[in-house]
Amino acid sequence: MTVTKPRSVQGRHISRYDWVPAAAGWAVGVIATLSLLASISPLVRWIIKVPREFINSYLFNFPDTSFAWSFVLALLAAALAARKRIAWLLLLTNVVLAAFLNAADIAAGGNTAAQNFGENLGFAVHVVAIVVLVLGYRQFWAKVRRGALFKAAAVLVAGGAIGILVSWGLVELFPGSLAPHDRLPYVANRVIGFALADPDLFTGRPHVFLNAMFGLFGALALIAATIVLFQSQRADNALTGEDESAIRGLLELYGNSDSLGYFATRRDKSVIFASSGRAAITYRVEIGVCLASGDPVGDPRSWPQAIDAWLRLCQTYGWSPGVMGASSQGAKAYREAGLNALELGDEAILVPADFTLSGPDMRGVRQAVTRARRAGLTVRIRRHRDISDAEMEQTIDRADGWRDTESERGFSMALGRLGDPADTDCLLVEALDPDDLVVAMLSLVPWGTSGVSLDLMRRSPQSPNGTIELMVSELALRAEGLGISRISLNFAMFRSAFEQGAQLGAGPVARLWRWLLVFFSRWWQIETLYRSNQKYQPQWVPRYACYEDARVIPKVGVASVIAEGFLVLPFSRRNKVHTGHHPAVPERLAATGLLHHDGSAPDVSGLRQSAIADGDDPQRRLPEQVRVRLNKLKKLRSSGIDAYPVGEPPTHTVAQAMDADDQASVSVSGRILRVRNYGGVLFAHLRDWSGEIQVLLDNSRLEQGRAADFNAAIDLGDLVEMTGQMGSSKTGTRSLIVRRWRLIGKCLRPLPNKWKGLTDPEARVRTRYVDLAVNAESRALITARSAVLRSVRETLSAKGFIEVETPILQQVHGGATARPFITHINTYSMDLFLRIAPELYLKRLCVGGVERVFELGRAFRNEGVDFSHNPEFTLLEAYQAHADYRVWIDSCRELIQNAAQAANGAPVAMRPAGGGRLEPVDISGVWAVKTVHDAVSEALGEQIDADTDLATLRRLADAARIPYRAQWDAGAVVLELYEHLVESRTEQPTFYLDFPTSVSPLTRPHRSKPGIAERWDLVAWGVELGTAYSELTDPVEQRLRLEEQSLLAAGGDPEAMQLDEDFLQAMEYAMPPTGGLGMGVDRVVMLITGRSIRETLPFPLAKPH
């Protein structure tokens, strides 16, 4: 997959002359191409003879046959297009000289009309070209290697001298008719003069084949000099100790995301940092490609700065930017900077918590491990720091001896320095034979704080099959004890192609692509790497290559092959010891003094504190008011004031202080909400949970300090402890006259508007803590909710019920028909469900003889979120032995009425009135009771009962425009009619009795009416508040109903209950006749307070920002 976006690198503004390099390159390139064709083909030479002679005479050097000149012009064209300044200088020099010659000829006169036209036209073209090149000077910013001009001149002189000497020797051996005194001048003219001197100046001629050889020597010298001149600057500087130390610090702070991050410490790479020092890119330059490895290191927020600095560097030296092994996050950052991304393959990640050798998918690994263990192999795992120097030397010798290449390969996914003293956190996994001899090893580098990434894999030719599988498996199985949660194995190139091509129904292109990869795997380990990782059932994480333009993909690919060591060029410096001389660390970071010259990691806490002290926290983008408060906090700390001290209990709450006598000494604590400063006297409003009080700070009454000190140190929202005497202000306002005060909590973020508070409902949900701090109504709601919960417990306890707790994590979801949340327990490698209801466990207690039991706790249903639904909610379930569903009518009404009394002071429910107000509605007394069929009949205007057939019910539903599903039975259609026509239209609290049996699988059939279950629902103002059953205690009937539910679940119904065999077995021990109640406590709170579920819950579920 490739995604593209035009790159717009900051810092280089688009100029009106931005087209000049490309135009100059095209112009010279056309001449180079035609010159090459003319040198090859006499036909082309004949076709272009007239324009070529004109261009050669008046505009630009254009000989009819010269391979050397064609090649030189091609290099010049490429250098111009790459914006190299030396190419601009050469072209400008050539044009200026040509213009001077044309001007001289024009001034000399005596030419024909055709010659005058050519010279005037050529001079005009040269003048225009000079002006354009001068105006476009700033567009040629790319540098070449230092001293390239002198090196090129030296190569030309040396090459020319060698060519002249060799040619002189040849002409002495085969002089032909050439006079002895003309031989050296003749060959010099041919080799370095390109035969510009007239042949008639020399006496005689050598053999014809010698002239071609003399020209070839000169061409080779010129070509070599041109290559040296236009070569891109190499990145000669590698990591210094300070650079490596900074990178290690960034890895400790931000290295958890990229498994390849530690490989950025390879010392044969160069590095460039973001200006802030919080991100860096390591790279190497090969064949004009600046190849970055993996993601930028450091804070992802600073990646754009690092990428921009890297792209600027590429532009400066004319390098083509390329990236190998970027993660999805890194590729996105490079793409946003304008590069393109191409998926290369996938990295195999093992999660030890999910790893197991059991199961059919792991059969191959399990058998390999068994073979290795039968051969007597054991595994030893150690950190490098725990290995002695002598052992490490032996380890290095073994690794070198078992290597199947002459030197270590790797660039983006290998470290290449086993046993380095700086890598003490690396992990060594060894396989030992029965004689304790090492027969294989893995070395893994750190990946953040809890992961490792494979660096080196070696095995002895004599090691038994399954050795590698044994080491990987043991590492995964022992990972928890080693503090490892992630293991990065090998990289599989083109993994998706193997999988897609092998799928049933794969298209011809996918199959052909897979066949090609399998074919080339005979020479390169493409398929082998994929298969060797796939057998561990890893998570596959994609890795990307990034590039600037599609035309440079081959170049980037070759550069990658060179960097990884698969292709070694002549004069390669791959095995050179790399030590940088010029630190790339920004001065700001170096000035901290935290970096180490030996490359070891700096004090990370010091780096973090230094960044915060500079007011530039890498974790956050801070608003201005927050920065002001942070600066104030810094000043308080520098003055020795602890802004977050140990707590001391106040003597009074605000409410108690307000009731205290005048002159009473009190101490209160709370949040400052308002401040009014009148110079020597300052008034503030302090609020705790019980209320709000005015505090008065008078310079004459303070034991120490002044009111101005309070004003300077305290911001709105700060927590303050006030001690003083109760009294009144001059206006008679009850106040606390402060003697001393103490800051107990500095608020670093400003509170909302003091008059309006939080007006956005979503903001109130997301920042409930702020809402509670400033909104008295929110505090009243949370208090009312607490009163309801307490009242429910007290009412049930007074009736002899005991409260229990049953499991929230359940192996089978049951007790209600709802979609559950699913989680996973690693210890037993099994899925669990967050309970949708505690019913089945409470009934187990009933079987055990607990006659009156209830649970008030959380339940979870993976359903919608609206005015009355939240995925996590509070549910009451209670069971009373030797009772039925009618017993719970009075008990449920009593529960709700008592809760309303506790929350509102009277048995009233708050209902919306006009203007957004709430008004109380009396809910005392006895509530209405109706059967479901009677209520539906009233709504339809036609009598129905449990015997009404399905066709009639469907006809009535169609007439009422109530939709239903074809697979529903009569009971389900009745329930749908009830929900639309009865429940949603109910006002006053009403009990609806006797539901169809088919929609009540856990309910006892009615004792006298077939097809009816003994169940009621309590509904008030369109919301179901609770339900009660005469519980089904017949284990045989219970099994039949749950088996029906399990069949629905197997058929794909996500809300159907599963078969709980343990529950059914418990029921077979006999459960007494029982009446059960289920009540949504959140909805009862809604009824009593008149608010939505999101308002009454302290922390309802909210979408992330």
Curated annotation (Swiss-Prot):
Coiled coil: none annotated. The keyword Transcription does not apply. Its EC number is 6.1.1.6, 2.3.2.3. It is found in: Cell membrane. One of its GO terms (molecular function) is ATP binding. Signal peptide: none annotated. It is a multi-pass membrane protein. Its main location: membrane. Residues 604-1105 are annotated as: Lysine--tRNA ligase. This is Lysylphosphatidylglycerol biosynthesis bifunctional protein LysX. It comes from Mycobacterium marinum (strain ATCC BAA-535 / M). The gene is lysX.
